[in-house]
């Protein structure tokens, strides 16, 4: 195969709607350009610096064909490795290189992987409201659109605060009460099952808001409502407690969106402590490690449900879909409808049809960035208060 030299790399941040989205663009001497997602929306400038100041000079002049070698070099070149900034930066380049290779092969990405194992991937979306009436309205809307899986949240992560008794002059932050959250969420499950029966599968994201003993109690209480899965019931630092949950509840568990390092998921998969791996593809370094992780999970009966939130470019979401139609153990894909500005910046962003997402048949990933449109939505940064989650006594808790 003829050498295809990398001639330029650019990192672009744009904020068409709520989130700062990061795209890496790799140009080659063949004239083929690739696009990849590097979104770490809480630290976008750090990722851009990593790409512009470190990866770009490292990669200019290298052969874009050698994706595996370039990935390994990017990961170890700084000596320190497997952190969210470097992984997202590497991911942007890695996805772009796969995009280039698929375009040169004149194949959609999933065909380059080895073809499809399914026609389409089932999707779930988010229904969130501070009241049950508002939640019912959203569920009804999504059922009409053909969704069979809906993530239901009463209020933001941690629930709807109700007369929280804080300390005097409380420290600034986003307060919630864990006992209120458990009680209200269990009641939410009960109400949804009473109203809808088994018309759809309920998913729920705890978002690591509980202590381990509370997580055990919560899992036991919601088990009777047969959730499709409970997500992030514990933070990554407390995964040893998953055995305790497994011993007391059969509720399906999904975990992984915060993982960066293979050591964070290997034992969970080998010991079958989770039913679904929820890794964020750019957070683990892109397509190259995601394919390896998917096949590793298959050996142990663990299914794939990649993290796919709104703070991800449609390029990254399209990569998830290509992975999902290829990997036999893919279970479901998260999806939140794109707003008009995002669709303008990322033409061809896919939307579900009757509860399913279909992989693009265009050569490559199938979604690119309109660089001119992206300039209309410059990056904005402010400290996030929702990640300053606090318990009533004022102590910080994992967000």
From Swiss-Prot:
Protein origin, superkingdom: Bacteria
GO MF terms, alphabetically ordered: magnesium ion binding
GO biological process: amino acid catabolic process
Keywords assigned: Magnesium, Metal-binding
PANTHER family: D-GALACTONATE DEHYDRATASE-RELATED, STARVATION-SENSING PROTEIN RSPA
Family from the record: Belongs to the mandelate racemase/muconate lactonizing enzyme family. GalD subfamily.
Protein name: D-galactonate dehydratase family member A1Q3065
Organism encoding this protein: Vibrio campbellii (strain HY01)
Lineage: Bacteria, Pseudomonadati, Pseudomonadota, Gammaproteobacteria, Vibrionales
